[in-house]
Amino acid sequence: MTGLFYRKEINEDKFLKIGLIYDLKTSLESSTFSQLERRIPNSLNVLVIDTIANDISREYIIPKNYGFGISYEILDRLSFGIDLRFQPWKENSGYEGQDNSYKNFLQISSGFEIIPDAEDVNSYFKRVTYRGGLLFKRYPYLINGEETNNIAATFGLSLPVGSISRINLGFEIGKRGS
């Protein structure tokens, strides 16, 4: 995967960040062996009846991948952003010689992070980082001819432990499927 990242300083503690990713299409090669066999009752022996496929090589294409993200940050206070990812699976036919239909993969996610006061030594909860987000994914595969989508809300906390350590907790609630 290849990417570009640009960070623009708006002023001393405010930043605009932009990122792009691109991944070339790749292929997976596999070989298939399939045989028809019969198990002999009350025995560990197997009777091979017929070899259906022996060492058939196949190629499976994983399509290229594009992504774009933009975020705004106020240092040690606030950050929010949005990411988009796209993968053109629709042009992929799956294994060579098989009729597979795919949809294009799409992911849209957005989120925020708030730290009320990172330097307040008198209030633990003002140093906690609070996170939230929304997510939509359209998966490339079909189940029973139907699209499979994922819609979710995410929540998280980053709890300070000592002077430099943190415990991160994340939760996701949503629906996958149609």
Task: List each language-model region with its residue ranges.
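Outer-membrane beta-barrel porins/channels
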Residues: M1-S178
